[in-house]
């Protein structure tokens, strides 16, 4: 059976202006984030050569513990690790709470794609894997 294609417009990535290595205390307004890639590798230290501790999935709400060019984050099941600054979207507590309350789609297929528009020939926005959480934006035909 052909897997139905998911449709969602993903939020824009917020890119930090901070230079790598600069230490920043995390304010209450930026102590939260949402994972914005399908699978996010969490590491022992803030560098790509460091060992991987666990993984987080797209749409997972996390707490930001500190920032040093990489974010140290904590998952809802209390795992901690370091992630590159581009794989999470930092946000205020209010926006974080809104995300948690919003209706979601949970990906159950092993693998799939999100598209820019509800059309199989539209530009691919991202891959998705089982367990990814996307904010419900409505449906059109067999696109969500």
Over which residues does each language-model region extend?
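Bacterial Sec-dependent N-terminal signal peptides
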Residues: 1-28
């Amino acid at each position: 059976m052909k897997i139905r294609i998911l449709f969602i417009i993903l939020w824009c990535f917020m890119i930090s202006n901070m230079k790598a290595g600069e230490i920043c205390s995390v304010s209450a307004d930026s102590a939260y984030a949402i994972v914005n890639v399908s699978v996010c590798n969490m590491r022992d230290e803030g560098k790509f050569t460091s060992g991987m501790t666990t993984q987080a999935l797209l749409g997972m709400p996390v707490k930001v513990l500190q920032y040093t060019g990489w974010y140290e984050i904590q998952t809802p099941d209390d795992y901690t690790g370091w992630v590159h600054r581009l794989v999470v979207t930092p946000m205020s507590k209010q926006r974080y709470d809104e995300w948690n309350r919003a209706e979601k789609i949970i990906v159950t297929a092993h693998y799939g794609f999100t598209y820019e528009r509800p059309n199989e020939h539209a530009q691919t926005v991202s891959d998705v894997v089982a367990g990814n959480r996307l904010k419900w934006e409505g449906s059109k035909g067999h696109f969500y």
